[in-house]
Amino acid sequence: SQVTTYMMCSGSDFFYVRSKYGHVMGDDLNGTLDCGCDTAQYNSFRKYYRNHLNLEKEGTDLVAYTLKRAKEKGMEAFITYRMNDLHFNDTTTHCPIWYTDFWIQHPEYWLNDTTQGYNSGGAFDFAIKEVRDRKLAIISEQLENYADIIDGYDLDFMRFIVYFKSGTGPQNAPLMTQLVKDIRQKVDEISAKQGRKILRSARVAPTVEQNMMKGLDIREWLRLGLLDFISTGVHWRGDPAMPVAKFREEMGKELNIPFYSSIDDGGYRPREFWSHGM
């Protein structure tokens, strides 16, 4: 095919392989976590964890294996990291096996703003330093673990594009810019150790205004040289009228790196088009 770059999602606060920052997705911690009466959901999570254990016994790291396979097929191999995944932070499900360690242990770090769509009340609040520090630590761990494999690291800000309380995005944008700078510094450190350049990319919203509303000052990121390429997209549902030309026009000469726009495809019930944030 004409595909040249393969990106594997490494999750967010749940992990597909062992991490010092939390347990593997589906681990019920020796039977101490369940999913209430929803045995189907519980069994689904447990199935993933059993598969993980089987691979682990064979010495197979799921992320490493997948990235190596992509490189064997002649593609660039990237990790793409969900910056604030909201799938697993709904306490009304009464399903503890869904909850990540750091999230359930620190409700004081929740955004508590339900106006931004799906599960946004339980989103991590990036205005809090401890949240940003943890994200940097997780990303740093992945960079170190897969430094000899990856060609690049992608920050997926569209999963989910909720970072600050409504109306406070622009004033908090410098905090997110500093986080991206810190990640860039870590990537550069790993690149120097490897003796080769590891690329940095980000997936963001389709317009400059939408990004700034959410605290993502992409103009400043490019001015500071924090990214090697950028992509725009929507959250899950496809948009046949993606404003690619508008993005180019808004960015002007500041768009000095390769720019891609994604094709997204997903099904929603009618009410979800707006409840899911975009």
Per-range role (PLM):
Residues 1-58, 231:
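N-terminal substrate-binding region of glycoside hydrolase catalytic domains
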Residues 8-12, 80-84, 155-158, 203-205, ...:
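Active-site-proximal beta-strand/loop segments in catalytic clefts of secreted hydrolases
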Residues 11-16, 56, 205-213, 232-243, ...:
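Acidic-and-aromatic substrate-binding clefts and catalytic sites of carbohydrate-active enzymes
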Residues 17-22, 82, 88-95, 166, ...:
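Short, solvent-exposed loop/turn and secondary-structure capping segments
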Residues 24-26, 95-98, 219, 248, ...:
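Short, hinge-like loop/turn segments at secondary-structure boundaries
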Residues 31-68, 72-73, 78-141, 271-278:
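Active-site-adjacent "subsite" loops/lids of carbohydrate-active enzymes
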Residues 130-258:
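Active-site neighborhood of glycoside hydrolase catalytic domains
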